[in-house]
Amino acid sequence: MSPTVFREGPFRFFFFSREEPRLHVHVTSPDGEAKFWLEPEVVLARQHGFGASELERLEHLVIDHEQEIRDAWQRHFGC
């Protein structure tokens, strides 16, 4: 199961139900995929296919939606 937290244009922000417990979010689009840690701070964990400007935009979107991502994580995992 991989619940979608939000969408922005071609980007889908989501997480996997059975993955590591450290708070993070995945992003996918037709052009690539990325994973961002949210703890201890928002930082790119890995990516494939995105250019520098897209990664910058994605990082800003994660920061802008950080509370929404945290709330979805807590609802889903019950922590």
Outline where the language-model segments fall.
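Intrinsically disordered, low-complexity segments enriched in polar/charged small residues
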Residues: 12, 29-31, 70
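Charge-dense, helix-prone N-terminal extensions
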Residues: 2, 10-12
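A short, structured beta-strand/loop element
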Residues: 16-52
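Intrinsically disordered, low-complexity and often Lys/Arg-enriched segments
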Residues: 1-4, 78-79
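C-terminal structural segments of small proteins and small subunits
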Residues: 49-79
